[in-house]
Every structure is written in C-alpha cells, then in structure tokens.
Amino acid sequence: MPSILDKVLRMGEGRILKKLTGIVAQVNAHEDTVREFTDAELREETDVFKARLADGETLEAILPEAFATVREAARRTLGQRPHDVQVMGGAALHLGNIAEMKTGEGKTLAATLPAYLNALSGDGVHVVTVNDYLAQYQSDLMGRVYRFLGLTTGCILSGQKPEERRRHYAADITYGTNNELGFDYLRDNMAWSSGELVQRGHNFVIVDEVDSILIDEARTPLIISGPASGDANKWYAEFARVARRLTRESDYEVDEKKRNVGVLEPGIEKVEDYLGIDNLYESLNTPLIGFLNNAIKAKELFKRDKDYVVLKGEVLIVDEHTGRILAGRRYNEGMHQAIEAKEGVAIKAENQTLATITLQNYFRLYGKLAGMTGTAMTEAAEFQGTYKVGVVPIPTNMPMARLDKPDLVFKNEDGKFDAVVEDIVERHAAGQPVLVGTTSVEKSELLSTKLKRQGVPHEVLNAKQHAREASIVAMAGRKGAVTVATNMAGRGTDIMLGGNAEHLAIATLAEQGLDPNETPEEYEAAWPDALEEATTSVAAEHDEVVDLGGLYVLGTERHESRRIDNQLRGRSGRQGDPGESRFYLSMGDDLMRLFNSGLAERFMGSSAYPDDMPLESKLVTRGIASAQGQVEARNFEIRKNVLKYDDVLSRQRAVIYTDRRRVLEGEDLAEQVQGFLTDVVTAYIESATQAGAPESWDLDELWTALKAVYPISITPEEVVSEAGNATRVTPEMLTREILSDAEHAYARREEELTPDVMRQLERRVVLAVLDRKWREHLYEMDYLKEGIGLRAMAQRDPLVEYQREGFQLFSAMRDAIKEEAVGYLFNLEVKRPEPAESAEESTDGAPVVPAVPTGSDGEPLAPEQEAVPAGEPERPAKRRPAARVATRPAAEVDPLGLDTPERPAALQYSAPSSDGGSSFSEGRVVRSEGGTSGGSARPAAGASSGGGGGGANREARRRAAKAAKKRR
C-alpha cells in the first residue's frame, strides 16, 4: 500500500519541476539588471518590495525580482551565487513544499531566498535547525546577506534570557532549534504577564533536516514539568539493589524490540523476600511495581556510553539520531531516577507535567510549513498525511560520482573491527581522508583505542567532544585525515575536500576578535581577504585529495533507519566530487541481532567459519533492508498513535491557550466574569430543583452552597414570600431573583474595589485559576491515557474512549474554572492602598494591584509584574496602562489561612526520546529565569474583607458547596 501511495504522490513531480524551471527562468531574466545596481540601490530594493506588498501585490508577483536581489546580495557578501537548482529549491520552499536536495547542494544558501521573500511581509520567518551550533553558524553566515539587504536576524539558543529571546523573535528572520522554539511556545502559554511573552506568532517556517525533526524526533512530545509533591527517591536506590540481585531469563524477561520487561514468578518471590512483604501486587504495594520495572529497564535496556554518559556525577542523555549530548534533559516517569540509582549518582526529584505539545502539532501552528533535507522521498506519504506538504526532489548541480560499495558482514564484532582498522590504516597510508561512523560513544572510543595501537593519528567526534565539533568537521576532508564520529557528523555538516574555507575564514576572524553581530562593519570589511586566503590554502589540497579518490565514508554498523545511513554516506561525493562508502557489519550488531531472520547466521554459524572472513551476498542485503523496514514501520505506528491521542489534547489546548492569551493581552473580563457568575448560579439552581415538587426543594442547602460563591443578600423566606407560598416557587423565578441579587453583589464589589482594581483582580484570578485547573487536567489526561488501553479487553476502541472521557474531563474543568474564579473574586481579602503611597509608586497611570493572590491550596493565583529589560524604557501598553505590582505592597490577598509556596524555580524540559520510544521522554533542569518564581503573600492587619465573614465561615461554605457539587 505505501508503495502505491508513493507512486501516486510522485505523479505530480514533473508538473511541479516544470513550474520551478519556469520560475528559475524568470529569476535569471532579472539577474543582469540587479547586477548593475550599486550596494545602496540593491539595499533600497527591500523598501520597494515592501511598498509594493503594501499596495496589494502578492509575494508570488515579486518573487522573481526578490530572488534575483538575494542572489546578487549573496554573491557580493559571501562570494557565492546560488545555482539554478538552489533557486528551484528556494521556490519549492516558498510554495510550502519539502525540497529534497542532496548533500553539498547548498540547502542553507537556498533557504535565504524564500526567507527573505516571506520576511518582507513583516510577520517574521523562522528557520529551524537540528542544534544550537548550526543555528548560530547559519544565523551568522546568512545574516550577512539579510543585513546587506536591510533585514534583521535573530538566533534562539539555550541559556538565553527572556529579554534576549524577545529581541531575537522580533527580528525579520529568526534561527533556532525545534526544541527551543517549541518550549518558548509552551512557556509563553505559562506566562503571568504580557511582558513575559517572547514569540510574536507563527507565520512561515523553514525546517532544515526536516525528516530528522518531523519524523525521527516526532515520536515523543515536548513537555515542561515541575517538581512533583512527595519524596519517592529512597525507593530508586533500594530497587537498584534489588535489580542487581535478579537474573535475566530466570527472574525476568526482556523484549528489546519493544523495550519492555516482564517479571517472572521467581523474581516476584525474591523481591517480596527482600522487601519483607507478603504480596507485591496488593493495592498497598502497587506503586512499588513501577520502581521495580524501571530498575530492570535501567539495568537491561539503557547502556552507558550508548544511551547516556556520566559526566561530573550527572547522567546525561545522548541523542541516538545526532550523537550529541541532550544537555540537561531527563527521562520522565521515573526512568532517569532509576538510571541515576543504577550509576550511584545523586538522584533528582520526579516531576509533574505543566505543559505539553507534540512536534507535529507545534509545526501545524504555522501558516506555511516548508523543509529541506537530502533524504525525504521515502517518507513522502507521511509528510503529506501528517503535515499536508509535498516532497519535491531537486536535481543536483553536478552528477553524483560517489561509489557505494556492498556491505561486508563478519561473524562477530572483533573480526569486524579488525577489518575496519586494517582498511583505515591502508587508506590513511595513501593519504585518502576517512570518516568512520559509529552508533555510540562506546564504539567510537573502542575504535579510537585500536587506531592508537596502530599509530594512526585521528580525531574523535562524539558526545564527549561536542565542543570541538566545528574544528574537527572543518578538517575532516584534508589529506590523510581520519575522523571517528557518532551520528553527529551525519547531519548539518559539510565536509569539503582539502578543508572548509568558510570555517577557516570564520575561525581566523574570531581569533582577531571580530563578530558579525557585535562588529558588523569591521567583519564585512575583513571577510573578503580572510575568505580569499582560506580558499587559496585549501584549493591545492582539494585537487590532491580528488586524485586520491575523495572522502571515504566507512560505517561500522547499520542504523535503524535507512535515512540515517544515507545521511552518513552523503557526507562524501558533494558537488560532483569523487567519493566512496562502505558499511562493515557483524552478526552481533543490534539491528542484526534483534531483527535478522537467522539465514546469515546459518551460513556463518559453523565453528570452522573464520572470524576475519566477510560475507557479501544479496541475501544479507535483503535481510538488512527487511530489518530496517520493520523498525521504520514500528516507528511510523508509534508516531501515528502519538498524534491521534495528542490531537484530542491539541483541540483542548487551543481553546485554553486562546482564552489565556486574551486575558494576558488585557481584554476587559467584566462581561466574561459576569457570564461565569450566571452559569455557576444557574447550575446550582438547576441541580437543586431538578427533582420533586417545589415544596420538597431544600432551599436552605442551596443557599448554603451559593454563599460559597458570592455574598447572597436575599433569603429563601423572601423568595417564598414573593411567590406567595412554597408551592408557587418555580426554577425560573429562583433564577431571576438570585441572578438579580448576584448582579447587585458584583456591582457592590466593583464599587468597593474601584473598577481599575476590579479589572486587574479579575485578570489575575482568572489567569491563575485557569493555569491550576489546566495543570490538573493534564495530570488527569495522562492518568486516563495510561490505562485506556485496557478498554480493548472490553471490546471498546481505546481512542474513542479517550476522546469521549477526555471531553467529559475538559467540560468539567471548564465548569470548575468558572466556579472557582467567581468564588475567589468575591471572597479574596484585599488590602486597600493608601492614596499617597499609590501616587508615589504608580507614576505612569497604571493601577496598583494586589500582590500575588493565592487559593486555599496555596497555589499562586496571579502573575508577576511585566519584565522590562534593564536599561530600556518601559513599553507603552496597548489598550490602557498595564497594571504593575507596587514596590511596597499596596494590596495583599488573604490566602485563606495557608502560606503561599514559592513557584518552582527549576522546570524540566522533556523533548524527543533518545531511544526513540514514546513511553517516556527526557527533561531538562534550567536556570531560574526572571519572572518565574512567585512570592509569598500573607494577610495584612486591617485588611477589609471583600466577601464578608471570617475564614471559618468561608471554610464552612466551601464544604457545603463541595457537598452540593457531589450531589449534582
């Protein structure tokens, strides 16, 4: 079926390529004209294009001239003129497609064409890369083109302060990684004031290495979490000791394909004896089962120096797709703590989800999505089905000259690595540069040790040496160079024969203290000479390496995905250069061991078969392709499943985040809050009058419940008297009388606080209640999803059940937000500010508002003041002056007898899993940013009560309200 769908999707290739060829002809027609422009005239074209767009012209109408302008700017600033195939790629990106451009074809430069064109609208363009290094590098290099044309660039990096991020997002073109952009979106929807927002919308995005980001990394959602309550850390160390006492096969089973474990009866008995309990599966002991399973998984499924490394007493995850350390990210659901216990390092606390989104749904937020990669056609069906974007294969500028040799399979790993070392020694002696790809830090260091014994000088590029990545990659194509690398060298790196002139020029200018952002004029002036010097130094060596056969890529193990193998191969043979590639495999490799059918083992299983004799046959090649196909099919199902379930939460998230943004941006909530009050009161009345005759209604109980919502001033007797007698009381009459009283109570509350303070109090209360209820809802949805699979045993579709019950939970949450927000508005105690102090503290006309309000559970109820970067003037508010928290508390809120805990200063950021699974994800502890920790508010002496009555009376009303809700 997929092959048929692929054929259908490829039927339109000829048509789109014909259209792109026509666009190239139009761009070329303008080239001579723009080449005659002076630098100033070329810069003025940007203003001309913006004016034409303002007059109603479309982006498509100005595309040929805009592309020609960028092409000329790139020629003048970088010394590089985009080829026709790069213009085709840029046009494909602008049209909202994925451009498949082979390695070395200049994807980064091609992206400048649509980025410039779409930035002219003023709505911003995001360019997404796979890591911080590439984001910074591309921003610095391509930013020279944009700045030449009068546009601004930004770069989002981990560790930046909120004000830095806001400034970079405000630029015309912003570079960053998928995780950083996704987390900023989630953080914006956790902000407590409009001043904390950093992003400005999602207009157009270009995703570099799009298959890695939207396919490989899409199996696990982005999650922001905070410390959970309780201390379960003691059990992790205890169960790490238990796991060491258990034996594989006899005490437990391991399914490495599905990455699951199962404890057998003998193992259960050992655990019960060790813990001194009678039954591990009693309800009281049920939580211990999770600790046991995680301890066994940590022991069997997570390998040190492959899945993670231990540096400075900390467990750091290694990304299987890139080989890079995922700085500070952590596995969720207790998995990271189990690994920490296994390694004997400090165990950090567990976390609770605060915000989450999948990469699929994040990138669906953009008005237009485009991407580029060297390997996309194999996933064309998934790109079309999930993201509604097509894949366009762009022709190469020069014919491919790389020779891909057949795989060699050895009996065991020792024989394989001996042959690998022998091959490297031979190539190195001839002077041919060699790039060796490994699948883990452990294997790269093993091979490095063997090469040292042979006296072969080499560089190692893995997660432990990631800081030297740029310099290592820049030199990997030089004569005699030997580079041993994990997947880090597979994407986003351009290995040029003889050396990378651009990298050398950048390094030279950096040594001179020149920076493209800090000293742009000096940098531009020095660039031509630096580039010319670097180009001259590598030109002669380039020709020499070409004569030696180009770069030799040697893979030591097949990856789960064919695309990752192709990415490694693609480092060689760029722009028509010669090259060579070959994979060395063994029957002990993970892919062969887990998915091989056993045919190759029967050939090589004989004890007489030499360890150093390779097997080369079509049968093995087909077996490898079959194994990779199984893994890719499994991962595709995981991604589809993740998306189906997240689509349920995505619709709910869109509603909540839209409501939240309106509150943050200063919308007048008076009408909405009065609507809340009407809905809550009506629901209480309907619950009390839905059964029985009027004389049997318990009006006293209804009144007790209503007093927990607002200070009701009429009595049941007055309502009965108004009707004549109890039998003549109707639900409509009750609703009319009580709603009228509630409206008067709202007006009295507003008059007491003043309209300005009332509006700000409404904003803070609604925002805080919404946040807390949304967090609780995420927890409930997680809990629901964990057990929903069991519904299949009752012949019910788990997804349908999840959708149905998820909607019920969402509806209940919306009702709870209304009820709790109204209750807080009437019952919070507010200290009135002294007029003199108010005038002193608030000089910009902004109302002075209460400090952080809190609820009965101690949760913060309000955002902090708007963050203004140091040294900058305060930004004017859009609709009316923004409320500020006074330096000396002008108003405080009664926390109903409980202390207010500080808002967590350290959050966890969970991103795509390093092992590609969907049952857990990683998180990251980050610095405490400005505006993230809440203060403690205590009741002040002399505070006036907004809701009447003391704390004890309020508590009684709340208990009565809860009882009424249960009956409802």
UniProtKB/Swiss-Prot annotation:
Keyword ATP-binding tagged: yes
Lineage, uppermost ranks: Bacteria, Bacillati, Actinomycetota, Actinomycetes, Micrococcales
Pfam families: P-loop_SecA, SecA_DEAD, SecA_PP_bind, SecA_SW
InterPro entries for the chain: Helicase_ATP-bd, Helicase_C-like, P-loop_NTPase, SecA, SecA_CS, SecA_DEAD, SecA_motor_DEAD, SecA_preprotein_X-link_dom
Primary localization class, coarse: membrane
Coiled coil (residue ranges): none
Protein name per its UniProtKB record: Protein translocase subunit SecA
Family to which this protein belongs: Belongs to the SecA family.
Low complexity biased stretches: 883-892, 910-923
